[in-house]
């Protein structure tokens, strides 16, 4: 009998650390959670992407965690940490079994491994006061947040483009030296009331660009501003200024951040967020104008209009071309720090207008999107074999159909 007691006591001692671990509260205040997520996304893409919009989204949900028992598909898609199958399984589990009683219950849902659960823990909860946010002026003043961010970057080693050069050498190779100073300056101001209202201004000067001098007397080389409001009756979203559009899988139209490759094949499928306010510094991947979404369940209707200037290479038209100048290619670097890049700046206008209608019935979404694009000058790609299927002309009409379940 004494041996049995010793055995039971020994088993209790061994099991104690496991039991204690299981009772530890969930640490949802991991200070590195946002940085870890950005690093994970960066590891799965080869492109140089500005992650400020993703960072802002994660920081918002870290401060205002999603109540999983009261959430919907759109909010979970906005978080960007779960794929379509995981979102479906979570919503079906709650619909079938009722509200979650513990975050550890996520382990019983198909598709939620420990890595996924740990990645979303800082941004979710299952309890708390969930009184609906209202459009009250006093509440907007008391609960809103203003953020001013300034970043200065400089490379200590002298770069070749800033080294002294003789006038004769510069005349022979005018693009061998940068026109401006050797630092990068980025500043952003944003006012936000939860995720319902935001407006802000972003400005950036790249390495080698002039600042309040020469060709940049207006100061920064790039300015961006937006006003965004949502959830006012049937008006689901309204964006004025700079914004991005994300629909379907991006074959018809998609602007802004998009996750590319992934180690998991299941993560290839995208989750479009519709109309998204733009506050990043990429000088190409956005719309400039206005966009609106109206919802009358089960239908949602989107409409948008945009006009902005694009950088492009310009060449004189030949004798067979009715236009005096043609565009041979569009420039996407956003840099304006040499003679040639200054010449290419804002050479062509882009006008875009379009609409989308989608229907969501339970977990089935069906949508159709169409938009018209007109450029200020004709685009005439070169005659190389790899350019054979490149766009040519100055007008384009895109129409697409997408579905998801």
What are these regions (language model features)?
Residues 1-8:
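Bacterial N-terminal signal peptides that target proteins for export
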Residues 3, 65-67, 99-102:
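Short, solvent-exposed coil/turn linker segments
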Residues 8-17:
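Bacterial N-terminal signal peptides
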Residues 18-22:
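Sec/Tat signal peptide C-region and signal peptidase I cleavage site
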Residues 23-81, 85-92, 127-133:
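Long, highly charged, low-complexity intrinsically disordered interaction regions
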Residues 78, 85, 91-92, 96-99, ...:
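Outer-membrane beta-barrel channel domains
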């Amino acid at each position: 009998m004494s041996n049995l007691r010793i055995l039971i006591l020994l088993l209790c001692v061994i099991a104690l650390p496991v039991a204690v671990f299981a009772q530890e509260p969930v640490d949802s205040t991991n200070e590195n959670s946002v940085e870890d997520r950005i690093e994970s996304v960066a590891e799965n893409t080869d492109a140089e992407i500005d992650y400020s919009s993703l960072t802002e989204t994660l920081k918002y949900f870290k401060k205002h965690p999603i109540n999983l028992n009261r959430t919907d598909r759109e909010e979970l898609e906005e978080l960007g940490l779960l794929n379509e199958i995981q979102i479906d399984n979570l919503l079906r589990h709650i619909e079938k079994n009722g509200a979650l009683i513990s975050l550890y219950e996520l382990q019983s849902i198909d598709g939620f491994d420990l890595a996924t659960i740990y990645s979303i823990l800082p941004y979710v909860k299952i309890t708390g006061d969930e009184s609906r946010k209202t459009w009250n002026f006093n509440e907007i003043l008391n609960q809103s947040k203003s953020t001013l961010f300034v970043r200065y970057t400089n490379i200590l080693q002298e770069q070749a483009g800033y080294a002294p050069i003789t006038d004769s050498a510069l005349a022979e190779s005018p693009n061998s030296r940068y026109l401006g100073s050797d630092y990068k300056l980025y500043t952003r101001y944003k006012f936000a009331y939860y995720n319902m209202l935001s407006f802000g201004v972003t400005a950036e000067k790249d390495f080698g660009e002039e600042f309040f001098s020469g060709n940049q007397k207006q100061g920064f080389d790039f300015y961006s501003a937006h006003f965004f409001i949502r959830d006012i009756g049937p008006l689901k979203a309204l964006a004025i200024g700079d914004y991005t559009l994300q629909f379907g899988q991006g074959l018809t139209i998609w602007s802004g951040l998009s996750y590319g490759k992934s180690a998991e094949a299941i993560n290839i499928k995208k989750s479009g967020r519709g109309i998204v306010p733009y506050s990043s510094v990429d000088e190409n991947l956005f719309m400039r104008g206005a966009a609106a979404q109206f919802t009358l369940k089960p239908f949602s209707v989107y409409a948008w209009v945009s006009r902005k200037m694009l950088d492009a290479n310009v060449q004189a038209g030949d004798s067979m071309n009715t236009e005096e100048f043609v565009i041979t290619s569009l420039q996407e670097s956003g840099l304006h720090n040499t003679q040639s890049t200054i010449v290419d700046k804002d050479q062509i206008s882009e006008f875009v207008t379009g609409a989308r209608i989608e229907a969501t019935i339970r977990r089935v979404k069906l949508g159709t999107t169409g938009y018209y694009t007109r450029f200020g000058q004709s685009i005439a790609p070169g005659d190389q074999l790899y350019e054979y299927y490149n766009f040519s002309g100055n007008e384009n009409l895109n129409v697409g159909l997408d579905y998801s379940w």
